[in-house]
């Protein structure tokens, strides 16, 4: 599995919006952020520079790049952290997010199951007003999103 395949899968889930945030992070939301959606997965697209070949420089091992973070939920969080290659997600561990250090932590089918579960967990936590908005026809949803973004732009 890789970032492009996971991106295609995530965008195929219901009510998913993507947004670039915090540098080179592709963040996936259940419902658009403008209408109160919540994020459920994040792919780090940052490509670190190749290590220096200087003889006196030690390779950096403590700053392992995390490829993908997602909402695991309280029920699965501890069990997932026992799996090699999964760690608590920085800044998000307190809300039961895990992060993958490698793409081969799961098979393609397992990745899909994990991210589908993250989507479902997050969808269930959305406020009633946001869920009601997501139940509207797509054209109405888009109109509400555009209006919400206009209001946010006026405030800033």
What are these regions (language model features)?
Residues 1-156:
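Charge-dense, helix-prone N-terminal extensions
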